[in-house]
């Protein structure tokens, strides 16, 4: 290899290249779950069944809807936006990092097969080309009270639901729902949704994207709950109404504050060293 070619290879930003590869693969994997958004209304005759523990797929419509919303919309689209502008959306990589940690704590003890997904997410985080930004939680703007208030309200409403599902999973209540670890899966996805909402309220770089995705996810789950009020794990009609209204309010508040911030200078990010 000539000296010029060697110099060119050395000048490549290998960390950025690896990040693009890992993040692209994982984003594609997460986005393939978007088909699950059709679960509340889809015919089970053509709907894909990829878990042999689900003896009656019709029972799992709500779990599938929540899986598609949080994994496909919230996580998948967040990672896609991060691929587009990794330096300008540091809050999104922090969300991915915390989601990977949360999955390891919440779900891995029940579902060891999830280790592969957690490792892939960890590789995305480790390859992030601006590592100092990962541990920088400072912000140039104060926490957005409206988003924080909506996040707290959602957490208070979902906490009894989360505690109940954890109890059911540990005690193997609910037949194939427990056998397929669907209760703890719903806990994981509910927790990640709340995480996205709380992080969006910090107004760190990327908060507009995370706030919008969190609002869309919450609104969709409200519609899904209204369509599946009596299904196992569903938030029911009342919960669906609250989720739909809350999601719309979250998106509206995000959009309103984003308009106010559009002319404000962005905080310079730490160097990648």
Task: Describe the predicted segments one by one.
Residues 12-16, 61-71, 98, 182-195:
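Hydrophobic alpha-helical transmembrane segments
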Residues 32-68, 103-116, 161-187, 223-243:
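Membrane interfacial helix motifs at helix-loop boundaries and amphipathic/re-entrant anchors
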Residues 1-49:
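N-terminal signal-anchor module of multipass membrane proteins
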Residues 2-6, 10-11, 132-136, 252-269:
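Membrane-interface capping segments at transmembrane-helix boundaries
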Residues 188-272:
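C-terminal transmembrane-bundle signature of multipass membrane proteins
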Residues 11-26, 89-93, 131-160, 203-217:
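Cytoplasm-facing juxtamembrane segments at the starts of transmembrane helices
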Residues 21-32, 97-106, 116-128, 143-168, ...:
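Alpha-helical transmembrane segments of multi-pass integral membrane proteins
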Residues 66-80, 115-132, 188-198, 241-256:
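Hydrophobic cores of alpha-helical transmembrane segments in multi-pass inner/ER membrane proteins
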